[in-house]
Amino acid sequence: MTPTTADAPGFTERYRVIQSRDRRFDGQFVTAVRSTGIYCRPSCPARTPKEENVTFYATSAAAHEAGYRACKRCLPEAAPGSPLWDVRGDVVARAMRLIADGVVDREGVPGLARRLGYSSRHLTRLLSAELGAGPLALARAHRAHTARALLVGTDLSSADVAFSAGFSSIRQFSETIGEVFGMTPSALRSRRSAATRTEVAAGEIDLALPVRGPIDTVGLFGWMRAHAIPGVEEGDDRSFARVVRLPGGPAWFEVRRADDDKLRLRARLTALADLGTLIARVRRLFDLDADPLAIDDALARHPELAPAVAAIPGVRVPGAMDADEMLLRAMIGQQISVASARTMQGRLAAELGEPASVAPEPMTLFPPPAVIAERGLEVLRGPAARMRAIVEAAGALADGSLEIGPGDDGAEQRERLLAMRGIGPWTADYVRMRVLGDPDVLLPGDVAARAGAAQLGLPSDPAGFTAWSQRLAPWRSYAMAHYWYAAPVTQAWRSPAETAAAAAVARPSRRAAVVDVVANDVVAAVDDHAPDPDAAAPARGASGAPTPRGSHAAAARHQAAAPASPVAAASVSAGAVPAAAAPATLRPVPTTLPDAESETPA
């Protein structure tokens, strides 16, 4: 989005937004007013400026570069981030995700350009043309946002605020605050209200996390609690805490839900300069920059999903604190239950992890890839081929032959992962959903999601499930969240009232009940909900077809006899093609027979 003036396309729509003071658009663009020299968020309560005095910018950094300062009344820097950087997968969006993660502060513009595969000059041209500001200005705006939050929400000294926000000197910090906000750091701090202050222990930081509502905190904390690695993570229905490695050393954080459904972050850091990176990763973990009203509106247009959306407004799809850890957790969770995956992950942490002295109570850091590559086979349990695949992936992450992160191109990341032994479409796409925040990922091989679809009266066979869900693009990741929450196996994640509301929209059938048996026997959802079709080769009968075993055989016989869903039949007859099909040149890598808890791959 280049600067938008009164005669440019899109100006009228944005001007209507600021006339209505629509909070849904906060963080998606800023309004610069030439007559006052300030820029505001779309919902600013001040009088709407005249059209001829208005210019719209995609980012606050672009407004800074054009000579504007932030409005003291609406504080545009305190708005949630733009959801566009997750919806879009182009180089600009990838750059914005990496800038938020602190890459420019740690590696400079050359480091950012290298990660994206561009020269520094070309990347600067791209960002300036699209956003009105280059990478240095965008990183500076991000530092200013972090500094404002610390000045208003903590009692840290100005020096600590400066270095926590990523500034290299107190002078640079003071000059930036003055240019962006039009006041000194002490004056900005004096404007805070008593409500923004909280009592914290020595060495801790406590901040509010801006959220674009509504937000399904019940589902988020239930999800986190269900998948918490013992010793590394812990959670209940109102909070989630864990320890994590950051560039400057280990850190501990806790996100908690206040009575008004707002979220607060409490943290302890080895290096204060990691705070901006921590905030960015926590926001991604809790999907706080999503546009829930737009997502809910799009999904609710389909009558089959409307009741589920009404029962759980503001659903979120959790991201990942650490990309390498996310991949290894997903691989460990292949074809086993969530409980079994947590047990194995907890054993890894207990035997190979390091104590995290930064935490307020004893906790352990999840072992890095290099340690798992060296000693993982001593601890991991399960089919030998799968364990070797996990260790090989850890080795590739450790030596740099495999790199994944939030700045990846989605298609390229998927191709790299599928080239690894033991990684199939489910794992590759699940990692893309969690690490990149891709809003349009469907997992046809996910048993729990298909069980949830059956509960909602939707096709639950992989082909029908894929074909029907195509109409939900580009929000299929959020549809997956609704499918997961509709599955019987996840009902314990929600409070009794929430469970009753979710159950009221389900339409169980005899066929769905059989699928539920499979889902409960195999998986529970999320990190590890489903078998990856390429993680293990199924047993084969004389005909060469997969041979179902145990309860799966009963389910297979029942599904073979059951009539096809009318919705599925209509979708397939319409010529729908599964969007998540793997490239033809990438072949499944057979490993071993399924273990006792795995389902025969479809």
Where are the regions that the model predicts?
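HhH-family (HhH-GPD) DNA N-glycosylase catalytic core used in base-excision repair
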Residues: 1-602
